[in-house]
Amino acid sequence: MKKSQALLLGAGILSASFLMVACSSTQSNAADKTYSYVFASNPDTLDYITSTRGSTSSITTNLIDGLLENDKYGNLVPSMAESWTVSKDGLTYTYKIRQGAKWYTSEGEEYAEVTAHDFVTGLKYAADKKAENLYLVQDSIKGLADYVEGKTSDFETVGVKAVDDYTLQYTLNKPESYWNSKTTGGF
């Protein structure tokens, strides 16, 4: 009988000590923590405009901002665009690009400021390279399908333009209430 009581007492003390250790606070500093992630495969490219492969996009979506982004509730909020307006007919979207955003080299050196012209250049690049995710906007933006299909070689006919360094404008073929959700990507 005494042996079983001793075992119970020992088990109780051991359980209590585990509980105390589990509930105790640690003294680690949040600044000392590093997030690490192991990818199943190497990315095929870091060209975020032309590739939609999972191994690429899981990296590039953390490096490149779209005009808008989703907040934790799924609402569209400003990202590279600090504000935007939509014409009354729903065909023209005008975005004010956030000033002070920078491009950086692979070595982390500041390269240039992000401007509206970069978004125009990015869309032309995606169209010229027949980017995998171009289908998301190809039939939405005025003239883009004709440019991609070779019916015109003049990119000026495509409904995207930099009004000035920090104003970007898209003209659509028809109103799309969900257009802004297409601007969360990099082009």
Predicted features and spans:
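Bacterial N-terminal signal peptides that target proteins for export
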Residues: 1-9
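Aromatic- and charge-enriched surface segment that lines or borders ligand/interaction sites
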Residues: 82-133
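Surface-exposed binding/hinge segments that line
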Residues: 118, 127-187
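C-terminal motif of bacterial Sec signal peptides marking the signal peptidase cleavage site
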Residues: 19-22
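Solvent-exposed coil/turn segments that connect beta secondary-structure elements
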Residues: 40-43, 51, 72-73, 89-91, ...
